[in-house]
Amino acid sequence: MKVFVLLTLAVLLMVSADMAFAGFGCPGNQLKCNNHCKSISCRAGYCDAATLWLRCTCTDCNGKK
């Protein structure tokens, strides 16, 4: 039961994060990722270490929850 609850929480946390799933410069060009996120009304973007810097993750996106 504990494993199920932990897995459910992990999935909910992943779904609730504002992420752009395509590369958008990652890996190697974090500035391109940041510019992409700003272009879609997010505050900033970075190449996510949890995905070995392959995914651009946007933060503080307006109107997306």
From Swiss-Prot:
It comes from Magallana gigas. InterPro entries: Defensin_invertebrate/fungal, Scorpion_toxin-like_sf. Has the structural arrangement of an alpha-helix connected to a beta-sheet by disulfide bonds (CSalpha/beta). One of its GO terms (biological process) is defense response to bacterium. GO terms for cellular component: extracellular region; membrane; other organism cell membrane. Belongs to the invertebrate defensin family. One of its GO terms (molecular function) is lipid binding. Antibacterial peptide mostly active against Gram-positive bacteria (M.lysodeikticus, S.aureus, and the marine bacteria, B.stationis, and M.maritypicum). It acts by selectively inhibiting peptidoglycan biosynthesis through complex formation with the cell wall precursor lipid II (1:1 molar ratio) thus inhibiting cell wall synthesis. It does not disrupt cell membranes. Is noticeably more potent than Cg-Defh1. It shows no or limited activities against Gram-negative bacteria and filamentous fungi. Transmembrane segments: none annotated. This is Defensin Cg-Defm.
